[in-house]
Amino acid sequence: MKLVIIEPLGVDQDKLLSMAQAVLPQDIEITYYDTRVSDTDTLISRGRDADIIAVSNLPLNADVINGCSNLKMLAVAFTGVDHIAMDACRQRGITVCNCAGYSTAAVADLVFGMAVALYRNLIPCNEAVRREGTKDGLIDFELEGKTFGIIGTGAIGLRVASIAQAFGCRVLAYSRTKKDVPGITYTDLETLLKSSDIVSLHTPLTPETRGLIGEKELSSMKPSAILINTARGPVVDSAALADALNCGKIAGAGVDVFEMEPPVPADHPLLNAKNLIATPHVAFATREALVKRAAIVFDNIDRWIKGTPANVI
């Protein structure tokens, strides 16, 4: 049986292969690629003989899936699978397993890093000190007593809710499924947007969530509110968000995800928006989280080989 790790998984190669060998059967043949490529022919060449492919967030389209004729199992080192041609996998009976839970703490950390940075003007303060300035014009807000709106209460959303409560925030939530968690008040999306001082997105990308936050939704938010997106880029209309920031419809935003994987083009509307903190899709990527993720990948593969698959999509 052949396993192809088709792109780097964020863990040192020697450590990654050691982790794989400690879990998987000794007779499995492992091929590791230490570069990311995007062209279909090269991806097919890498995966053509594989029974199992491990991939992170590298897009695998239907041509790649169908070009890997031996493929039986796809181990996705990511929570979302919107970058995978799932219809092609289903048509061929390929098992697809994801990694859930590895980045819960990491993503929540970045949410509050962004919230505090925006609320306390950390970037302008840093710039002021470096140009021999003072705090004039930079005194802003604290989180305590604010209303923190969470869209999507999966594991990450609930972690964010817990931390928000620790900061002394009132927590509102809007989600497809409601959880009976003390301190969280569920409401409709319109009420959440109108009432919240901070809005944090934690939804998967689906036909229903694509463009969930657009011009209408942004216009309903408080002028003093901030929006944080560590979920999926297309959940938010980027042009509408840039306009809302530049026109003062909302006060600030933290964005870790875009319509494309970084590098983000220099002419992207958000890169020229006022009071925006942008990060290159790093919310999930701490050293601890990437090791957890690799462990889940190999456990998923081992369980599939044994006939007891887990985390099947």
Regions found by a protein language model. Name each.
Residues 14, 137-223:
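Rossmann-like dinucleotide/phosphate-binding beta-alpha-beta segment
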Residues 50, 68, 195-196:
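An anion/phosphate-binding loop that grips the pyrophosphate of nucleotide cofactors and donors
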Residues 96-97, 224-313:
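Rossmann-like dinucleotide-binding domain for NAD(H)/NADP(H)
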Residues 92-94, 100-147, 151, 159-166, ...:
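Phosphate-binding beta-alpha-beta segment of Rossmann-like dinucleotide-binding domains, i.e.
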Residues 59-71, 86-88, 208-227:
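Rossmann-fold NAD(P) dinucleotide-binding segment
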Residues 43-46, 64-67, 191-192, 217-220, ...:
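Structural alpha-helical scaffold elements that stabilize or flank donor/cofactor-binding regions
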Residues 1-50:
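N-terminal glycine-/charge-rich "phosphate-binding" loop or analogous flexible N-terminal tail
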Residues 58, 79, 197, 203-205, ...:
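Short glycine-/small-residue-rich Rossmann-like dinucleotide-binding loops
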